[in-house]
Structures are given as C-alpha cells and as structure tokens.
C-alpha cells in the first residue's frame, strides 16, 4: 500500500498536469496565463515549505495579474508566509492590501485578529493591562467583521468575543 506522502505527491502531480492542460486551452490572454503559472508555482513552493521561493513567484504573479480576486488571494498567501516567519507587521500590511483587492476574505480578518490577540496576551503576561485591552479591542473589531462575513465559520472566535464581553448584538447584521 502506498504511503500517504506518495499518494499526496501523485495527486499534486496529477492536479498540476490537469491545471496546465486547462490553462493551455483556455481562451485567456497570455499575460493571465503567466500570472496563473507564477501563482501555481508559488503555491507549490509554499506547500513544500520553500517560503522565499514562494514569495518570489507570488511577486511575479502580482506584476501580471489584473483580477482583483486573484490578486487578493495571492496577497493573502504572501501574508500567511510573513506571519509564519514572524514578520507580523508585514503580514498585517499585506493582509490589508489583500482586503483592498477583495474585501470578502474573512480569513484575512481572522488572521489579523490572531496577531492582535497574541499581542494582547503578551501584554497581559507582562502586566500591561491597558495595552492588553487595546490589542484585544483591535482583535475584537476585526474578528467581528470576519464573523459577519462568515457566520458560523469561526465558532472559537465567536466564543472569544462573547466570553471577553466584546461581542456586539449586531454581529450577524
């Protein structure tokens, strides 16, 4: 019986071959095809843990991509890498750019909130309760937006908002 890794590699390769075939026959401009190929290569590098290579591919994709939804997705993936690398400020900045391109990405808001909440916990551990409240309030603000965009999708966040007293009555409006 093949290992899960072998099966996953086979699926990845099969998907790549199918995607390449579709891209070749699609009636889209060459520029858009190249943007997609850079994006796809960036995603593959990111999945393999080669973050610097992934960022390079994503940057190339952004130079060519004109579709706002696709640009937002690319920027979101870049922000995830920055977040993984501990570059929180750059991650927040990139998530915000992703939201400018496509405001309907609740995961961007969720992840910004995670950074704010982490900073709040850090302030709390250091005894700075005023700073804690500032960061927790910022987390609540972006998390409330995420929950409005994706009701029921972030139950842990909804519980945090409720338990921390930062939930508003209109959260689902």
From Swiss-Prot:
Alphabetical UniProt keywords: Membrane, Photosynthesis, Repeat, Thylakoid, TPR repeat
Pfam families xref list: TPR_17, TPR_8
SMART domains: TPR
Membrane topology qualifier: Peripheral membrane protein
Gene3D superfamilies: Tetratricopeptide repeat domain
UniProt-listed SUPFAM superfamilies: TPR-like
GO terms under biological process: photosynthesis
Protein name: Photosystem I assembly protein Ycf3
């Amino acid at each position: 019986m093949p290992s899960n890794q072998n099966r996953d590699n086979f699926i990845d390769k099969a998907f790549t071959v199918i995607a390449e075939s579709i891209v070749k026959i699609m009636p889209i401009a060459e520029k858009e095809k190249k943007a997609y190929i850079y994006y796809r290569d960036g995603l593959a590098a990111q999945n393999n843990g080669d973050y610097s290579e992934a960022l390079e591919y994503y940057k190339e994709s952004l130079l060519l991509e004109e579709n706002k939804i696709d640009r937002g997705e690319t920027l979101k993936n870049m922000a995830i890498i920055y977040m993984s690398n501990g570059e929180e400020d750059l991650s927040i900045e990139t998530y915000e750019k992703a939201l400018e391109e496509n405001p309907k990405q609740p995961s961007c808001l969720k992840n910004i909130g995670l950074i704010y909440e982490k900073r709040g916990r850090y302030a709390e551990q250091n005894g700075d309760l005023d700073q804690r409240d500032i960061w927790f309030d910022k987390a609540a603000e972006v998390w409330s937006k995420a929950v409005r965009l994706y009701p029921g999708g972030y139950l842990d966040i909804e519980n945090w908002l409720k338990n921390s007293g930062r939930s508003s009555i209109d959260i689902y409006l």
